[in-house]
């Protein structure tokens, strides 16, 4: 606090350039060996050279599809792969990954193993006998559901939820989603239902706050209260 940010920005730029010189192929858009995590974490951390972001994301989606949407990552990938697929136009591919029920997957834990909490590792074997069965290690899937399906997000430019971003994704195969967040300013709620070929979105914004509701290429700014939109 109170220190000039310029030296830290310079250091960050130097590190970004170093990573890109060593690991990035600007012609192919591949980082390192092109794994799911390598592609996604570069996007997530903002180190991809300007103008190359979509190329890197396209390569990410290619490797995900080549792996038949199986999860090939740990902690860092669980945080970045679904989120970056969604950011760059591949939300349906992210959804396929998240709803997989064959191991390794979150769905396998629920449907086959009957877990109601998240284990520490994808595979619990005798050598991992001390692993936790209640671990947040792979918990970012819950954040993805809140941020991308329900679409409840904070605005980094307006801290403290003075301004809120509602950016739901109406993914195929789902007819109802609801998310709520008890912010410091009150309850934020986003719910959508698909009926008769249309989607009805109901959003509640706390008193004294504003929000941008973004669906596709349409953005509408609203104030506090409950707002019902049909798409």
Predicted regions and their residues:
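Non-catalytic C-terminal accessory modules of carbohydrate-active enzymes
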Residues: 9-10, 14-17, 92-231
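Catalytic cores of carbohydrate-active enzymes
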Residues: 1-129
């Amino acid at each position: 606090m109170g220190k000039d940010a310029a030296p830290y920005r310079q250091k960050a730029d130097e590190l970004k350039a170093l990573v890109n010189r060593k690991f990035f192929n600007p012609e192919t858009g591949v980082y390192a060996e092109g794994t799911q995590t390598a592609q996604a974490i570069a996007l997530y951390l903002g180190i991809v050279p300007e103008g190359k972001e979509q190329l890197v994301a396209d390569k990410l989606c290619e490797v995900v599809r080549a792996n038949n949407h199986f999860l090939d990552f740990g902690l860092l990938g669980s945080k970045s792969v679904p989120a970056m697929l969604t950011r760059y136009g591949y939300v349906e591919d992210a959804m396929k990954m998240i709803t997989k029920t064959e191991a390794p997957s979150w769905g396998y834990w629920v449907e086959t193993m009957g877990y109601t909490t998240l284990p520490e590792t994808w595979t619990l074997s005798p050598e991992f006998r001390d692993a936790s069965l209640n671990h947040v290690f792979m918990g970012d899937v819950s954040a993805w559901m809140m941020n991308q399906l329900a679409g409840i997000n904070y605005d980094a430019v307006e801290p403290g939820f003075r301004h809120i971003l509602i950016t739901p994704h109406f993914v195929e195969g789902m007819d109802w989603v609801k998310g709520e967040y008890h912010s410091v300013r009150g309850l934020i709620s986003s719910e959508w239902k698909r009926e008769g070929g249309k989607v009805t979105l109901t959003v509640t914004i706390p008193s004294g706050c504003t929000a941008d509701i973004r669906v596709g290429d349409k953005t509408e700014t609203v104030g506090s209260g409950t707002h019902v939109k049909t798409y």
